[in-house]
Amino acid sequence: MSQKLLPLNPRQMVGLADGNSFYCSCEESVQPWLYGKPIIVASNNDGCAIAMNRLAKKYVKMGDAMFQITDTIREHGIVTFSSNYELYGDLSNRMHSIFSSYNPNYERYSIDEGFLDFTGMEGFDFEKLGRDIIRSTRRGIGIPICLGIAPTKVLAKAANKLAKTDDARRGLYIIDTEEKRVEALKKLPIGDVWGIGNATYDKIT
């Protein structure tokens, strides 16, 4: 028997905005010559890869030891950086300032992501608003972002993930109807749903 989903609340909408490959994007924002190049940011002691942009993820995984991927770095022309937390912190604060300018109830969630509360804005043009937030952030600080908008934080997280993986969406994914919710959940692997840990995943698969 299939489980019936609870109806969406048209008055409640949440946005999750976050910086794409944030540490790498920070490096790109102050060094424009990096655009179009694979980038890795290494840990404090340059021991392992802690961040990669989309191009570098084709060749390197999170946590790879730097000394073990020397040949890969050379072969694919990957640009590497030591962590620069002063830069990342500064751009993070500026990015969150842009996000909060769109929403008085903005909730900073981590260094590179936060929730916007759009409750009570039913009927609003979220496509236009979302594009404006994405454009303002890119123009203001050079950081590309993705934005997911949905009735709950869990669905906003799911929408954000789909905004990253579906190039046709150009960084914005909105779940505002029952049909879109069903479509989104079909596309997203169970293990990628926010709040479902390994133990829960094992029980339901």
Whereabouts are the PLM-identified features?
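Short hydrophobic alpha-helical segments that form membrane-spanning helices or hydrophobic packing faces
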Residues: 119, 155, 201-205
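Residues that scaffold, gate, or flank divalent-cation-dependent active/transport sites
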Residues: 1-111, 115
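Helix-hairpin-helix
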Residues: 18, 147, 186-205
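Hydrophobic (often cysteine-bearing) scaffold residues that line and stabilize catalytic clefts
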Residues: 88-91, 126-130, 196
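Long, highly charged, low-complexity intrinsically disordered interaction regions
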Residues: 125-192
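Short beta-strand-to-loop capping motifs
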Residues: 116-122
